[in-house]
A protein has these predicted regions:
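Conserved C-terminal RecA-like helicase domain
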Residues: 1, 86-98, 102-188, 203, ...
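SF2 helicase catalytic motif II
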Residues: 2-42
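A short beta-strand element within the Helicase C-terminal
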Residues: 4-8, 188-212, 224, 239-244
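Interdomain hinge/linker at the junction between the two RecA-like core domains of SF2 helicases
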Residues: 6, 55-102, 145
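Residues immediately C-terminal
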Residues: 14-21, 56, 197, 232
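Conserved segment of the helicase C-terminal RecA-like domain
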Residues: 41-47, 53-54, 205, 212-259
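C-terminal helicase lobe
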Residues: 68-72, 89-90, 229-324, 328, ...
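C-terminal accessory/interaction regions of large nucleic acid-associated machines
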Residues: 281-522
């Protein structure tokens, strides 16, 4: 991509590092976004960046002076704010207050909470309290029971007219839930931070149940962003926001967006510097990076290609692989399937790059467990056969229904965060380091991990088919369709083929056709 007419970044505040206890913290998404911004600024004739509640912008003028910044406090709807000042850990009072708000008001409700676990807890409480409405979506409920279980809280919630929305849900389920809400088939939508990440809804009432995102407090900026989900121009001209906890205090810093690539100093991550375009790298940053590279043996091209990784993790992985004997390097230079010895080393390498991800997603950090988990997924016939085996194990383990639901969510987290993201990302880095070392040692060997990377990244689907999952076609449908070779390599032909299946295949159920309709706008 060498020439672009215009690029647009929505929610551009995500370019800025967040502050926790007044210190910057590392966020690989911020790194990746800034690397992309640096590239786009060098190839695009124009740019347009949009975001809410932003009063000041810092850093952009240091790398591009040709722009106009406009700050506006214009609102398309009026908001009524109700404060309840409930203590954060008083769950029983927050639950009863939420129920009271729902019972006393008509219309639709979005409930923001800190985590999927809390979302399920709220849903279960509302169901037990008799909150229910008919969605007329029996076919969807049966589909959920077939592929995910009747014990899953999401399934139970849908049957009672309550929707759940959080990041680890399959894309098709996320998008279908929003459709049900916007079409008023579901009147209550319980969300995590996905509510402010591109989800378009039209609720009259917003209940801010928690002032946290995970374990971290949300600032005034994020709080205002959530409030902004109440009301909708031409539908609800007045929105109602119910803040259960005391609202966070506003600071001037909350409305400032800092662009890291334009504010380089001694704290700028070295991997961000390596990933930036040369014309955006300051002399200070250039000296820091060169000093680091000369003191260590890391090749700059690998750091640049894998800029989202902290540079010390890349160095640790490089040293781990470089310590291996030639025969051990040879074991890692497979083309399709690894043997047990290679998989154990890959698992060890994964702990260097992704230990926090494993821990955060409740994955054991025992080498044998990781190796067995990877083999189980790689050797499964399809993504669904793997998930079905996990589901069967969970349901037959003689535990309570809430525990079953919690373990189903854990499996979905592992699939979304570990299998389809962290593992293929780490494998690509491992492959490049191995091949660099082979070249350095003059070994006539090559590691090619593309086969297993695709298995994880694309849910066992060939070529570009997995892109349709991101668009909202469930994997369960995609696995049924035999795509021709040209459709596998060309996304436009892939979309054209599935449209033909939609029009000509009489075996698709009404629900399956509906999924395809909404994803491909048929």
């Amino acid at each position: 991509m060498n020439e672009v007419d215009i690029f647009v970044i929505d929610e551009f505040y995500k370019l800025s590092f967040k502050n926790k206890t007044s210190e910057k913290y590392y966020d690989e998404r911020v790194i990746s976004l800034n690397v992309a911004l640096s590239k786009l600024l060098t190839v695009s004739k124009q740019f347009y960046m949009i975001g809410p509640n932003i009063d000041f912008l810092r850093g952009l003028n240091n790398i591009n002076e040709d722009f106009i910044f406009l700050s506006s406090d214009f609102n398309t709807v009026a908001l009524n704010i109700f404060e309840y000042n409930i203590l954060p850990n008083n769950e029983s009072l927050k639950q009863s207050t939420t129920l009271s708000i729902i019972e006393k008001n008509n219309g639709q409700f979005i409930i923001y909470c800190k985590s999927p676990k809390v979302a399920e807890s709220i849903a279960s409480f509302l169901i037990k309290s008799g909150v229910s409405s008919d969605t007329n979506e029996e076919e969807y409920s049966l589909w959920l029971e077939k592929y995910y279980s009747q014990f899953w809280v999401y399934t139970k919630a849908i049957r009672h007219g309550i929707g759940l929305h959080y990041g680890t849900l399959p894309r098709a389920i996320q998008q279908y839930t929003i459709d049900l809400f916007n079409n008023k088939k579901v009147n209550i939508l319980i969300c995590t931070s996905t509510i402010i990440e591109g989800v378009n809804t039209n609720a009259q009432h917003v209940i801010i149940y928690d002032n946290r995102d995970g374990n971290n407090s949300i600032d005034k900026f994020t709080h205002n962003n959530i409030k902004g989900r109440a009301g909708r121009m031409k539908q609800h001209f007045i929105g109602n926001v119910h803040c259960l906890e005391e609202s966070p205090e506003g600071k001037i810093e909350d409305s400032i967006v800092e662009i890291p690539i334009g504010l380089q100093d001694n704290t700028t991550p070295l991997n961000l510097i390596a990933g930036m375009q040369d014309e955006h790298v300051s002399s200070l940053s250039e000296d820091r990076l060169e000093e680091y590279l000369s003191a260590n043996r890391l090749p700059k091209e690998i750091i640049k290609k894998h800029a989202s990784y902290e540079i010390n993790k890349v160095l640790e992985l490089f040293n781990e692989i470089d310590w291996l004997k030639d025969s051990e390097i040879s074991d890692l230079c497979f083309q399709r399937y690894p043997d047990k010895k290679a998989m154990n080393q890959i698992s060890k390498n994964l702990l260097i790059t992704s230990r926090q991800t494993f821990t955060r997603n409740s994955v054991s950090t025992e080498i044998e467990h990781i190796s067995g988990m990877l083999f189980s997924y790689i050797n499964a016939e399809t993504h669904q056969t793997y998930f079905d085996s996990q589901l069967s194990r969970i349901i037959n383990s003689q535990i309570s229904e809430p525990e079953i639901s919690e373990l189903i969510n854990r499996e979905l987290k592992i699939i979304r965060n570990v299998f389809s993201y962290s593992i293929p990302k780490s494998l690509a880095l491992q492959q490049d380091i191995i091949n660099f070392i082979c070249q350095k040692r003059k070994l006539n060997l090559t590691a090619d991990y593309s086969f297993i990377i695709n298995i994880f990244e694309k849910f066992h689907l060939p070529g570009n088919i997995s892109a349709l999952e991101e668009m909202g076609v469930p994997l369960q449908i995609l696995q049924k369709i035999n795509f021709p070779d040209d459709a596998i390599v060309d996304i436009n032909k892939c979309i054209g083929y599935i449209k033909n299946v939609y029009f000509l295949n009489k075996t698709l159920s009404r629900l399956e056709r509906k999924f395809i309709e909404r994803a491909l706008i048929i």
